[in-house]
């Protein structure tokens, strides 16, 4: 597993599981309140997750996973990056 910095594999796998599941629900949800709840859950998780992993996923972008207007794009990017880190 090539994850760059010394990020524990379980942190990558756990984050992938959460983000992948939330992305699938968010992508197909037609409920604005459900989508808002998902944004809140993911942002809260991101604030407490492994800081090195967050930095790698954010790739220097301020407000990564925290802004409503870019949330879907950010979450897709995070899931894609996590998938590549696990292979």
Where are these regions (language model features)?
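Short acidic DE-rich linear segments
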Residues: 2-5, 83-87
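N-terminal acidic leader/helix
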Residues: 2-39
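Intrinsic disorder/low-complexity segments
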Residues: 6-7, 12, 44-47, 59, ...
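Long amphipathic alpha-helices with heptad-repeat character
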Residues: 16, 68, 72-75, 79
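A structural signal for well-ordered alpha-helices, especially hydrophobic packing surfaces
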Residues: 23, 27, 46-50, 79, ...
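Acidic, low-complexity, intrinsically disordered interaction modules
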Residues: 31-72
């Amino acid at each position: 597993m090539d994850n760059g910095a010394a990020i524990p594999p379980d942190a990558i796998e756990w984050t992938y599981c959460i983000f992948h599941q939330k992305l699938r629900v968010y992508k197909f949800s037609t409920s604005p309140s459900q989508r808002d709840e998902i944004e809140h859950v993911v942002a809260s998780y991101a604030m407490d997750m492994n800081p090195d992993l967050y930095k790698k996923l954010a790739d220097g972008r301020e407000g990564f996973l925290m802004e409503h207007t870019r949330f879907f794009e950010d979450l897709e990017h995070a899931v894609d990056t996590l998938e590549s880190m696990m292979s």
